[in-house]
Amino acid sequence: MAKASEHFFYVLKCSDNSYYGGYTTDVLRREAEHNAGIRCKYTKTRRPVKVIHFEKFETRSEATKAEAAFKKLSRKNKDAYLIQREEESE
């Protein structure tokens, strides 16, 4: 799915309906790692998880800034963010 030069911010929906935002260079690989319980304490106890959103960025810095901004949002604002992004992609 991704070349080494691609940078993604992604959002997972966990089995407890919580969200997890992260950074990766390969969304499918990272989703599989989360579901295998690799490299993430938060999602390890909330499996299975599913990628519900991702955005591609030119640089790692841009992607990690998007991740940090998402993580600061309240649940209500995360829901609104995801709805807005979904509407923009239609």
Curated annotation (Swiss-Prot):
Q: Where are the transmembrane segments?
A: none
* One Pfam assignment: GIY-YIG
Q: Which InterPro entries match?
A: GIY-YIG_endonuc (IPR000305), GIY-YIG_endonuc_sf (IPR035901), UPF0213_domain (IPR050190)
Q: Which residues form a coiled coil?
A: none
Q: Which PROSITE patterns match?
A: GIY_YIG
Query: What does UniProt give as the signal peptide span?
Result: none
Report domain GIY-YIG positions: 5-80
Family, as annotated: Belongs to the UPF0213 family.
PANTHER family in alphabetical order: UPF0213 PROTEIN YHBQ
Q: What is this protein called?
A: UPF0213 protein lmo0166
What is the originating organism of this protein?
Listeria monocytogenes serovar 1/2a (strain ATCC BAA-679 / EGD-e)
